[in-house]
Every structure is written in C-alpha cells, then in structure tokens.
Amino acid sequence: MENGVLKAPAFYISYLLKKNRIEYYDRMSEVRRSGSYEQWIKFFLRVIYESAQDAVETINLLTALHNQSIALIGEPSRVTQTLLTVFHYLETNPIIEIGKTAEALSLSYNAVARAVELLIGKGILAQTDKQGRTRIFSYKAYLVILCKDT
C-alpha cells in the first residue's frame, strides 16, 4: 500500500482469527499461563498463511471474472467509453445507483442509464432493489466472490 501497488489490504487476518477464536483464546491463555510463545507464533503464522492463500484465490477469481466480463462487453472498438468507465467503476463500487454513479464519474444520467441497461443485457449487472424512484443495481458475481465465507 505504501508504494501505491495496493489501495486496500489484500488479506484479512481478523476474519480467520474470529473464525478460529476458540483456538485463538486457548493459545493466548497458554501464553499467559506458561509463557509458551512458540505455539502462539505457530498458530499466528498459520493464520497469516491461510489468509494469504485465501487472498490469492480471491484475486484469481476476481481477475477471471474481470476477463469474462470484458469478453461479454465486447471489443473495445465496438464499445463506448462510457460503458467501460461504468464497468470499471463497478469493480470498486459493486452496488450502484444511476444518479450517484453519474455524479461520481462526471457523466450524464442518461449516459450511465444506457450503460447500465447494456450491462444488464449482458448479464453483468442486475437490479437488486428499488427505493422510491431510485433503482439499485449490483454486480452480483463480484459480490459473491467478495462475500464468500462470510
């Protein structure tokens, strides 16, 4: 993150610590009781390793989904720049509203609405909710990958 390669943490140790919280507490108690740090360090290193493995798997799945979605969108020469802009925005904001997306991307409401309809037609985006006149859309396949095991 310091060198600008990552914009956010790529793996989450806290998830695995919570998942294994009984073992976590047992090992911490053992450190307090006997001063045995080695077993704690081995446990923590295992958690880091598993978290890194999970991050690599998630990155691979997201990369494959990106490539699959780009293939569905079509050749860049046959696709509007707005469509690609909205698609790339979806990869950092997988739940959107047309108005807020238009504002965030400095595009017209109608241009974003057309891109959203095209993405729905290609099976990339789906309407998930409607709050009054505001429709909410999500990149469901992306969210499934990000939310696995939660």
Regions found by a protein language model. Name each.
Residues 79-80, 127-150:
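Short, cationic-aromatic polyanion-contact patches
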Residues 1-60:
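Phosphate/pyrophosphate-binding active-site loops
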Residues 92-105:
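Short acidic, hydrophobic short linear motifs in intrinsically disordered regions
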Residues 56, 99, 148-150:
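Short conserved micro-motifs at the rims of enzyme active sites and ligand-binding pockets
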Residues 56-87:
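Short alpha-helical segments that sit at the start of domains
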Residues 90, 112-122, 137:
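Basic amphipathic alpha-helical segments that dock to polyanions
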Residues 19, 23, 36-43, 81, ...:
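Generic recognition of stable, solvent-exposed alpha-helical segments in well-folded globular domains
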